[in-house]
């Protein structure tokens, strides 16, 4: 599936209720509630490589680390550095994933645990960065998504997630996350936008700041691309 994000910054309670009513009239399968945490970190300019320590006091390059922890990815955190390198971290052990409702898409293999090949963390990666890597990364923003709903349509080939976005407790808009099956064999950016235009028109989705960009159009990365879109849309 490919994804796109829309942020409606001028959404009002009336427009939000109206949009939910519109989707409900399409008789979707309700997949429950969800929330997310999106954090933005900037590199510590005083943390420089040893080989540069004799000639530089601070780093001349600014780098950014983004972490996305959606509740539907239990115990997992998507990370993106400088919008070009992505990874998904999990703190769920494989043998424990069966105990989680609906399971966990990502988990640490039992063999890794038995051989000590894990971080040994019980917390998500974004918490680890914030608590243990402060000398390297400084948190700039913590954006929250709350009150989210998940709608499944078109026999599961279309998923629409909605969420209210907050920064420091201040409402910043309505987020709409669209995930659709990509039937095109050509992974060009122009072709990726076509199915979303169809969805926007068919379901009368309000227009707003939108991103369907990907890290590499020739090699799609479902979660890396999603985190990239969050970094572009939730840039306050």
UniProtKB/Swiss-Prot annotation:
Signal peptide: none annotated. The keyword Transcription applies. It is found in: Nucleus. It comes from the Eukaryota. Keywords: Activator, Nucleus, Transcription, Transcription regulation. The keyword Nucleus applies. Component of the Mediator complex, a coactivator involved in the regulated transcription of nearly all RNA polymerase II-dependent genes. Mediator functions as a bridge to convey information from gene-specific regulatory proteins to the basal RNA polymerase II transcription machinery. Mediator is recruited to promoters by direct interactions with regulatory proteins and serves as a scaffold for the assembly of a functional preinitiation complex with RNA polymerase II and the general transcription factors. Component of the Mediator complex. This is Mediator of RNA polymerase II transcription subunit 20. The lineage of its organism: Eukaryota, Fungi, Dikarya, Ascomycota, Saccharomycotina.
